[in-house]
Curated annotation (Swiss-Prot):
Gene that encodes it: rnpA
GO cellular component: ribonuclease P complex
Keywords, alphabetical: Endonuclease, Hydrolase, Nuclease, RNA-binding, tRNA processing
Protein name: Ribonuclease P protein component
InterPro entries: Ribosomal_Su5_D2-typ_SF, Ribsml_uS5_D2-typ_fold_subgr, RNase_P, RNase_P_CS
Top EC category: hydrolase
EC number: 3.1.26.5
Domain of life of the native organism: Bacteria
Length: 131
């Protein structure tokens, strides 16, 4: 039986200050052909997701909604696998509306796996202060 994971409000980046924090202090950047992921470690008890889909990048509202829906669903399924708590902002690139849902989901899957590897590697490297 597959585990059910929710996507409650505490798993979302909601305020502008939190988005700014990720944009200004991103420790990890993951590039895919149609996505850019920015991420940083957080003090929050959970990993959180923010999605920025500008009209300039994706003109049609139904395409913006499709991208956001797939990004949320993908995050919801991958979030329990993160080794540490991170804030992630997902930004689509120009031309994303031309690819299918399957291709989009595959790119998201690759990006989450790469982000998980980077976060685990970083958590092993960070020294603890001994004063």
């Amino acid at each position: 039986m597959m585990a059910l994971y929710s996507f409650s409000t505490d798993l979302r980046i909601r305020c502008a200050a939190d988005y700014k924090s990720v944009f200004d202090g991103a420790l990890f950047k993951v590039h895919q052909p149609h996505f850019l992921f920015l991420a940083k470690l957080t003090e929050q008890p959970n990993s959180r997701l923010g999605i920025v889909v500008a009209k300039k990048k994706v003109r049609r509202a139904h395409e913006r909604n499709r991208i956001k829906r797939l990004a949320r669903e993908s995050f919801r399924l991958h979030q329990p696998k993160f080794g540490s708590d991170i804030d992630v902002v997902v930004m689509p690139k120009v031309g994303i509306e031309t690819i299918t849902n399957a291709e989009l989901y595959q790119q998201l899957d690759f990006a989450w796996q790469k982000l998980q590897r980077l976060a685990k590697k970083h958590s092993k490297v960070v020294p603890t202060s001994q004063n």
